[in-house]
Every structure is written in structure tokens, then in C-alpha cells.
Amino acid sequence: VASLKKITLIATGGTIEKTYDEQEGILANGTSILELMLGSLQLDGVEITHLSLMDKDSREMTEQDHLHIAQTVGTCSHSCDGVIVIHGTDTLAITGECIVSTFPELEVPCVLTGAMRPWIMRNTDALQNLVESLSVVKLVDPGVYVAMHNCVLQFPGVVKDTKQLRFIKKES
């Protein structure tokens, strides 16, 4: 029997976690839906540790937040085979760069992912991106990556293309 891959899933908020707040009439970060999403998947061969680090719209993240996420990735990397960071897409690239500059010799893969549309919306990309990140984190070499929309890119040099709503490698 193959050994279980230990994956740490760090939740930081973002669109993927937004739900509808009926009192305010808005989409907002609140109750985590990651457990619900994970519960809908058949996840053979992995043991997932879910860590809720923060619950923020990434546009509200500070430099300290990005560093806190990076330090948490570094700490978690010693006790698992891979790390997934669920993150808002607006500043996901900033956190990715922060992780790769803080831990250039990371010993496990770290995959950042999120969603352009919340899980509660019919045309969401949330579940696809979560599933992709769960596969990618088991297959790539140690380093920092983004996995979204059937595309995997390695940091440094990843940016969000706000017109095409996807991540791309920045031209040097």
C-alpha cells in the first residue's frame, strides 16, 4: 500500500470562500466552505490538514499578512509533503513572491490557488481550481506555484492578467 501524502491546506479567505450575506445583501467572507468542498471529493491517498489562518479579501491584506502566510508555509513545510494556500486572486501573486523570496529553498511544493467566481455561483471555478491544486501539489518538484484554470506556473515572475482573468508569467 502506497503511503499517504500529507497535504497542509492553508485557508486565507478570498473569493473562493465568499458566501452570500443576506443581511447585508453582499458576497462576503464568513463561514468557510472548504470543508464542504473537500467533503464532496474522493481523496484517496492523501491526508489533509486544514488550517484556517485568516479570512480576508486579499485586497485588504497587508505586508504583514503576506509575510504571515509565507512564514506559516515555511513552518508547515517541515511536517508535510506539500502545502496548498487558498488565497484571493487580487494579491495571490504578491504572496507567492513573498513565499519564494522568504524560502527560496523550500523543500516541498507550495501551490497557491483561488477562484475568480465564488463556490456558491453556478459557473464557479472554485472546485476545479481546488481539485487541480490537490493534483499539482503531489506531482511538481519543490517550489512555489499557482494552479488555476488548467494552468500551472512557477514563481517568481507570476502576475494576474486582470483583463483575461488568469495568471501569466511576466515578460522579462
PLM regions and their residue ranges:
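Active-site histidine-anchored catalytic micro-motif
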Residues: 2-172
